[in-house]
Amino acid sequence: MTVDGLPGAEQLQLLVTRAMPFGKHKGTLIADLPGNYLNWFAREGFPPGEIGRLLALMQELDHNGLADLLKPLRRDG
């Protein structure tokens, strides 16, 4: 996070390039994880470390209808 508590460009870019490293959706880009999966983590607790921070960020974007903001960051356009 940046000083203002907003995600930096690097974190947003990671959402469209980093794959889920474990679980039911292993190998799926974090930006492509289904909302119900992200919401489950929000209820049960995000894992520690960077993956947890990225999942929490993606859950916030998805929950607030802002996931389309990631489209320009995707490699495929």
Where are these regions (language model features)?
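DEDD superfamily 3′-5′ metal-dependent exonuclease/proofreading module
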Residues: 1-77
